[in-house]
Every structure is written in C-alpha cells, then in structure tokens.
Amino acid sequence: MEKKKHGTNSISEALKVKAAVEQETATPEPTPQSETESADKIKQLEEALAAKEAEAAANWDKVLRERADLENYRKRVQKEKEELLKYGNESLILEILPAIDNMERALEHACDESMSAIVEGIKMTLCMLQSTLKKFGVAPVDAGKGTTFDPAYHQAMNQVESSEHEPNTIVSEFQKGYLLNERLLRPALVSVATAPKEQ
C-alpha cells in the first residue's frame, strides 16, 4: 500500500512541475497597450540606428577628406622640395653671371700678343666656370645671329632696319641669357632686325 502512495505522489509532483513549466513558457496574450509600447520602442530604436548610421557615414566622409588632404599636402611638399633642390642656387648663379660676362668681354677685346698668357688664363677660368654651371643645369639661351626673336627668352634692346636679315630675327647679342633647368634665369639682351622702310 505504501508503494501506491509513493507512486501517486510522484505523479502529482510531475503534474505540478509540468504546469509550472507551461506557465513560465506560455507567451502572455498581447494587450493593445503592450503592442503600442513595442511599436514605439521599435520606432525609437530604428530612429536611433538611422541617426548613428548617418553619423558614421559623416565620420567616414570626413576621414576620406582628411586622407585626401594629407595626400595632397604630401604631394605639394614633395614638389616644393624638388623645386628647391632644382632652383635653390638661382641667386648664387645670378651673382656669378656678371663675372662670366666680364671674362667673355675681356676675351673679345684681347688682341695684344704680350697678353697671351693672361688671355689663356682667362679662357681656362671661363671654361671651368661654364662647365661648373652646366653641371648645375645652367645653359645659355640661343640668341645667335638669325635666330627668331622670342620675347620669352630675349629682351630687345633696339631694332635695326636690315635688308640682310629677316624681320623679327636677332642681328646681334649684347649680353648672353641663361636658363636654369630649362627655366629662364636671365633673358638675352639682343638687337632685332626690322624690315627697311620703303622710300
């Protein structure tokens, strides 16, 4: 008889546990008020998510712009550095050019045989200076007789009527012009031919 009582207790306990589990897992019947609260909560969360997504997109755009600005800055600094290396000695070269001009004039006017040693020394010095300048990218402007006058490289000191030369060509050069790495350092001072006036 005791066995029977023990079996009945087990069954009743099992039924109680089952009822408790069903009660815990059963979904409560939604009420209209809880549905409205849930919809409002979902709407708030969606709005917050949209705001955060917009903020993230704006931040990403800002990062991309900053990265582009930094890259442009690097390129500009690199270009300025290259220009500084290329043209940094411009003022020094401009100071040396008059000495070269004077040596060239001295050679043009040297005609005395007794000065041949001095003339030879000047030629050697001039040659060394020109060679050194060439190493640093200095080249003379082409301003020989018959060359077409180019205001980008030549400065006209006067105009000469000439039937022997084409109009707008160089007749003579007063002072050499120079380029530094293909950029004008000093224009050539020249005399330019014009067509003779008809009488």
Curated annotation (Swiss-Prot):
Q: Which SUPFAM superfamilies match?
A: Coiled-coil domain of nucleotide exchange factor GrpE (SSF58014), Head domain of nucleotide exchange factor GrpE (SSF51064)
Which subcellular locations apply to this protein? Answer: Cytoplasm
A single GO CC term, please? cytosol
State the Gene Ontology terms under molecular function.
adenyl-nucleotide exchange factor activity; protein homodimerization activity; protein-folding chaperone binding; unfolded protein binding
Q: Where is the composition biased (Polar residues)?
A: 24-36
Per UniProt, the keywords (alphabetical) are: Chaperone, Cytoplasm, Stress response
Sequence segments annotated as region (Disordered) = 1-40
For this chain's UniProt record, which GO biological process terms are given?
A: protein folding
Complex and partners = Homodimer.
Q: Which family does it belong to?
A: Belongs to the GrpE family.
NCBIfam families of this UniProt entry? Answer: PRK14140.1, PRK14150.1, PRK14158.1
Q: What does this protein do?
A: Participates actively in the response to hyperosmotic and heat shock by preventing the aggregation of stress-denatured proteins, in association with DnaK and GrpE. It is the nucleotide exchange factor for DnaK and may function as a thermosensor. Unfolded proteins bind initially to DnaJ; upon interaction with the DnaJ-bound protein, DnaK hydrolyzes its bound ATP, resulting in the formation of a stable complex. GrpE releases ADP from DnaK; ATP binding to DnaK triggers the release of the substrate protein, thus completing the reaction cycle.
What's the protein name?
Protein GrpE
Native organism: Geotalea uraniireducens (strain Rf4)
**Name of the gene encoding the protein in the UniProt record:** grpE
